[in-house]
Design a protein with these regions (language model features):
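Peripheral docking tails and interdomain loops at the edges
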Residues: 131-169
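Short, hydrophobic beta-strand segments that form beta-sheet elements in well-ordered domains
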Residues: 101-103, 125-132
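Conserved binding/catalytic microenvironments
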Residues: 1-122
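General small-molecule cofactor/ligand-binding pocket signal
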Residues: 78-80, 127, 146-148
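Structural alpha-beta junctions
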Residues: 121-126, 142-146
Length: 169
């Protein structure tokens, strides 16, 4: 419910620049609540998920909400945040060796940039989501990537990604 409202606020600033303040306020209220959901969901024997927004993506609430869904689904999540450089994502994937990497983008340009030069994520399954990735043709996505249509479908995609890679968690 909240993310579509934030998206409308974010798009409405073109007509009313005052809406930017409302979007920033709402973001600052929601961010710590979503982080608390992640902090309370650590499970030692759980499958692991690395979550980030790609380089150039300033909006983080979508991917943070997706990380919270992953945690609620049973994943132990490491959240890297917005504007994550490709090299940092690669290093994190090499170090943490997650079962799934979750990347979300609101903007088409950050999503397109990620797809044009995807990071080496090792054996991790890749799940992408958000309006930026939704706007791209399926053949523009990195090989093997799964696209989550919305947060409601995300837990199914995460489960399918685990099953496709033979990870039992």
């Amino acid at each position: 419910v909240v993310l579509p409202v934030l998206r409308d606020l974010g798009e409405g600033w073109r007509e009313d620049p005052g809406l930017i303040a409302a979007e920033h306020f709402a973001t600052n209220v929601l961010r710590p609540r979503l982080h608390r959901l992640l902090a309370g969901a650590h499970r030692a024997a759980a499958p692991t998920c690395l979550a980030a927004a790609p380089e150039g993506e300033d909006h983080e609430l979508g991917v943070l909400a997706a990380a919270a869904v992953a945690a609620d689904t049973g994943f132990r999540v490491t959240y890297l945040g917005s504007r994550t450089p490709r090299a940092a994502l690669e290093r994190s994937a090499a170090t943490l060796r997650p079962d799934v990497v979750l990347v979300g983008a609101v903007g088409v340009d950050p999503a397109r940039g990620f797809c044009a030069d995807p990071p080496d994520l090792g054996a991790a399954a890749l799940v992408v989501g958000g309006p930026g990735f939704a706007a791209l043709d399926a053949d523009a996505l990195p090989a093997g990537a799964r696209r989550a249509g919305d947060l409601a479908a995300l837990s199914r995609e995460l489960g399918a990604a685990l099953g496709a890679d033979g990870v039992t968690g």
